[in-house]
Amino acid sequence: MASRHTRFRFFYRVGFTPWEGHPIGQSLRDLVEGTEGTPALPTGQALDVGCGTGDCAIYLARHGWQVTGVDYVAKPLEKARSKAGNADVSVNFVRADVTQLSQSGIGTDFQLIVDNACIHNMSGSDREAYVREVGAVAAPGARLFIAAFPPGGRFGVPGIDRAEIERRFASGWTLLFTGDEQELDGRKTPAHYYLFQRHA
């Protein structure tokens, strides 16, 4: 089986990117913009892991966050930089692997980390490294937002269920909220979101 690096480089090369171009999910918008009963999360340093062509990173920058977006494929990062320029926002897009964040030079004090459909594509060993590395770059009290398909939710995506999410983040994180997210791929496939807080 091809590695995830090889698969995604191939997908971008041939233009098969069905995960791109969907609206920002309501659960993330509620966190960033606030709701009638809940204020918006205070802005600061944000990290978008597996940022692709940058839609989420640009959205966060438009709402006052200082954003770093990471992806290990060069082609989408080129497009992301162009889109950020057209949107007149500043985002630091970095080519890096989410399983090696602490070696990428991006810093270690992110107050918000966003994963829109990254961890659910990974193997078990990569997920273990992901959890370690996300924890290494998170500030005390940081929020981690994950939107992911469950197993069997989308063809070609391994998926990840709530039990595994909770098990992997049991040390060093507290699960604040979880729920359904219908807009991860334009309401075609059920998905779930998880909001964690890093222990101080």
Locate the predicted segments by residue.
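Class I (Rossmann-like) S-adenosyl-L-methionine-dependent methyltransferase catalytic domain
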Residues: 1-49, 53-108, 122-200
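A conserved beta-strand element that flanks and buttresses the S-adenosyl-L-methionine
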Residues: 114
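Short catalytic micro-motifs in class I SAM-dependent methyltransferases
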Residues: 117-121
